[in-house]
Each structure stands twice: as structure tokens, then as C-alpha cells.
């Protein structure tokens, strides 16, 4: 709380290891306004309303009312007509609720801009940077990131999607063609049950680094993993830290798919971060920003990827190639999506037209077209607009998204290092995790062997490496 921050700052005690923590406390004190307490309370109520509206959405599918997530498997169907029906059914509720969601966002927008002005800022974008303790990069850096993604990643994504179009043998790639396996291979079932899942994952992490493998084995032995999907279990996946015990806890809903393997690799990265940072004496010294937290998780996805084939890992050689190809293509696709979401939010809160619902929709289409190439949206303008209404971050966690892009660029550098010297790359990765929050973001990235960078030159080098690896894998799978 701000009151606790005031008391701690008033003590006047500081050391180099506490510098980042004290700076965060001072910033929280500086931007706090009593008048904003009811504003943020009202925003929480509006956020709950958004979740009620979207959480209750259903679609009729083959005579049954189904929650929208249950339509996802049909987007992978080899039957294109089935995919199109599933896509339209899943999008329709958002188009029907567009008026309600737009009205809800009108209120959120006004409250956020008011909170920013009451705290002495010109707009909510400018308020967010100190509020999120973004000390090491600026709004201008984010705009450089957008431009770099447009220049280097968007053309690569266009090439990836053109390859998909040719494999699917369609005249134009439509939005319902993006999830299906273009090779129409049999679905991969990497494990049968949670025992096999954890046993295999333990072997994988031991191959990455014996100390990381031992930490994961500790989680298995101490029952700090809840991985199976079951009736009545909350959705999603995450890693939580049990600070008193100095242990992480991983929660997810595994059903035996490739995505489950990648989710566990990701969450294990957070878990290894928790183990390493626990050596820092204070809780505040253990939690860096999301840019560093996601560096830990995204790097582990890539560091572990080389060990996922049998006899150590989950996949046959052919399955491993397919899973690796999908993962690397997803890395590129996600970067363009992240850039478009952040650029859109920047426009909303800095443009005089941000309060206008129609102008927001038009801006989304314009910005989306800037980054997203290779998909034919003709006749689907309303569906394309609906995409931002289901991006819950825009409604619930404004400006919390570019962190994923920044971390992905860092993780790709860690991965590049691992291709040259795997042991050294993992050692530096572990050194970075152990810093917790006692250093700034550039120093944490440097410890991991990466640069905190927003420029097109570095990003272009990494994209070239990813495309080279994609080409190598394609040459082996046909």
C-alpha cells in the first residue's frame, strides 16, 4: 500500500540492492491521489461487468449451446466449411454485444483519463509508464518497437502465411485458416496422464540444466503441480510463488496436447525464476517487472525446445519438427499482434478521437492492416473489428501487453546464444533470474546475455534467424 511505502521511504535507509525498490515506492507515492481511489474502484466494477458479459457468451453448435472456448477444436478441423462455421459462431456474440461493450469502454476510457489528469498527467498513456514502474524505456521507445515490428516481422509473417496458403491449396487465406495444421497430420498426443507428463518434463529440464531439473523434481515431490484438467476446476494456467516456503506452484489444465507441453515449459520458467530470486531477502526485491518475468518464461520455452524429442522428451523426431515449426511461427505471429494491440491503445489514449466509438473501430482496422498481412478479410470488416472487443487486456489491463513483445525479443537473444553455447546460455539465464528486482531492466537483460532493445536492426537479425530455422525444419518435414 502507499501508506506502507511512505513509512519505508521515511526511514531513509537504502542500499544499492534496495535502489529499485525505493524508486518504485517513491514513484507510487508521487502519483497517488486520494481522489483516484473511487475512480479505480469504479473501474474494477466495470471490469467485472466486462467479464460477466464475455464470460456468459455462448454459441449454438450442432444443436447445442456451447461456451465459446469449446469451439476452438473445430477451428483446427481439416474441413474448411467446419472451420468457417466455427469462426463465425465464435465471433457472432462479440458482434451482437458490440454496442454494450463499446458503451462499457466509453466509461472506462473517461475514468482512466480522469485518473491521469487528477494525478497531473496529460493522458492515461503518460500516467501508465510511472504507474507500471517503466523506468527503463519510454513511449517513444514503444513507437520505435511498433515501427521495427512493421518493418521486420510483418513481412516475415506474410511469408509464413503464404507458405500456409500454398500448403492448404486455397486461393486466399481466410481467418478460419490460421489454426488448422496445413500438413493435415494426425494430432499429436505427447503424454497419456499427469504422471507421464511430469516424469518426461523432469527429464527435459535435467537436460537443460541439472539444477533446474532438480528444482522441478522438488516441485513434483512436494506436490506443487496441479496440471490435470477436471470438472469444476478453474480455467487457465499460471505460476504462483509461496513466499514463506520459498517455493513456486504451477496450476494448469492439461488435456494431453502439444499446447500443454509448451504451457508447462513457459510456467516452469516462472517457477525457476521464483526459486532463483528467493535468495533476495525482501519480497519487493524478488519481483521485477513483467518484462523480466516473461523473459524467464519465454526463454525457457526456447531453451527446452531442443530437448523435447524422445528418448528424453515427448515427441518422435517428426512430431518434434512439427511442434518446433508451429512454435517458431507463433513467435512471429504473436509479435505483430502485440505491436498492433499496443499501437491501438496508444492511439486511443493520446488521440482526441479516442472517446469516439466509431473512430476507435476505424483506428483498429487501420492499425491492424499496418501489421497484419497475408489474410483476406474481404466481407469480414465487422468480424475484424470484433477482434479488439475480445482482447481482454484492452478492457481490464490497459497497456499491459507490450511487455510480452519486449520479453520475446530478449528470449530470442537467449535462444540465439544457446545455439552457439548451450551451457553458457543457460548459466547466464540462471544468473539473470537470481537478480530478482535488485537491478534495472537493462542490467537483468545484460546478465541473461541479451539487450533491452527496440531497434529494427537487432529485431531484424533475430527474425532472420527464426526464418532460417523455420526453413531448415520445413526442409526436413516436407
Q: Where are each of the predicted segments found?
A:
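Catalytic Zn2+-binding segment of zinc metalloproteases
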Residues: 269-283, 303
Amino acid at each position: 500500500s502507499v501508506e506502507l511505502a511512505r513509512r519505508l521511504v521515511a526511514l531513509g535507509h537504502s542500499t544499492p540492492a534496495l535502489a529499485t525498490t525505493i524508486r518504485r515506492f517513491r514513484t507510487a507515492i508521487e502519483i497517488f491521489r486520494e481522489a483516484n481511489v473511487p475512480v479505480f474502484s469504479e473501474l474494477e466494477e466495470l471490469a467485472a461487468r466486462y467479464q460477466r458479459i464475455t464470460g456468459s457468451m455462448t454459441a449454438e453448435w450442432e444443436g447445442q449451446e456451447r461456451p465459446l472456448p469449446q469451439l476452438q477444436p473445430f477451428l483446427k478441423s481439416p474441413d474448411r466449411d467446419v472451420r468457417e462455421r466455427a469462426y463465425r459462431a465464435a465471433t457472432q456474440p462479440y458482434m451482437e454485444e458490440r454496442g454494450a461493450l463499446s458503451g462499457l469502454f466509453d466509461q472506462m476510457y473517461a475514468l482512466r483519463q480522469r485518473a491521469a489528469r487528477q494525478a497531473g498527467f496529460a493522458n492515461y498513456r503518460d500516467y501508465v509508464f510511472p504507474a507500471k514502474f517503466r523506468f527503463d524505456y519510454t513511449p517513444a521507445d514503444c513507437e520505435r518497437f511498433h515501427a521495427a515490428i512493421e518493418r521486420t516481422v510483418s513481412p516475415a509473417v506474410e511469408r509464413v502465411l503464404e507458405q500456409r496458403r500454398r500448403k492448404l491449396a486455397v486461393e486466399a487465406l481466410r481467418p478460419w485458416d490460421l489454426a488448422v495444421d496445413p500438413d493435415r497430420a494426425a494430432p499429436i498426443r505427447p503424454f497419456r496422464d499427469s504422471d507421464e507428463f511430469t516424469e518426461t518434463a523432469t527429464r527435459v529440464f535435467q537436460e537443460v540444466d541439472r539444477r533446474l531439473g532438480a528444482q522441478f523434481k522438488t516441485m513434483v515431490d512436494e506436490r506443487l503441480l496441479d496440471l490435470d484438467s477436471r470438472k469444476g476446476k478453474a480455467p487457465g494456467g499460471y505460476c504462483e510463488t509461496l513466499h514463506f516456503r520459498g517455493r513456486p506452484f504451477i496450476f494448469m489444465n492439461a488435456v494431453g496436447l502439444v499446447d500443454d507441453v509448451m504451457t508447462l515449459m513457459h510456467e516452469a520458467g516462472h517457477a525457476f525464476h521464483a526459486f532463483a530470486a528467493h535468495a533476495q531477502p525482501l519480497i519487493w526485491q524478488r519481483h521485477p517487472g513483467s518484462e523480466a518475468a516473461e523473459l524467464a518464461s519465454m526463454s525457457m520455452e526456447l531453451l527446452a525446445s531442443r530437448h523435447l524429442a524422445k528418448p528424453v522428451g515427448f515427441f518422435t523426431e517428426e512430431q518434434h519438427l512439427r511442434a518446433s515449426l508451429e512454435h517458431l511461427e507463433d513467435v512471429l505471429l504473436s509479435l505483430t499482434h502485440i505491436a498492433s494491440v499496443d499501437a491501438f491503445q496508444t492511439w486511443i489514449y493520446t488521440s482526441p478521437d479516442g472517446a469516439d466509438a466509431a473512430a476507435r473501430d476505424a483506428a483498429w482496422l487501420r492499425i491492424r492492416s499496418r501489421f497484419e498481412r497475408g489474410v483476406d478479410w474481404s466481407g469480414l470488416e465487422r468480424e475484424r473489428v470484433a477482434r479488439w472487443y475480445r482482447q481482454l487486456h484492452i478492457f481490464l489491463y490497459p497497456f499491459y501487453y507490450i511487455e510480452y513483445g519486449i520479453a520475446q525479443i530478449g528470449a530470442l537473444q537467449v535462444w540465439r546464444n544457446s545455439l552457439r553455447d548451450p551451457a553458457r546460455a543457460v548459466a547466464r539465464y540462471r544468473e539473470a533470474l537470481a537478480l530478482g528486482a535488485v537491478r534495472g531492466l537493462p542490467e537483468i537483460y545484460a546478465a541473461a546475455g541479451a539487450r533491452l532493445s527496440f531497434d529494427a536492426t537487432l529485431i531484424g537479425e533475430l527474425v532472420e534467424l527464426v526464418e532460417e530455422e523455420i526453413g531448415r525444419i520445413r526442409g526436413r518435414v516436407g
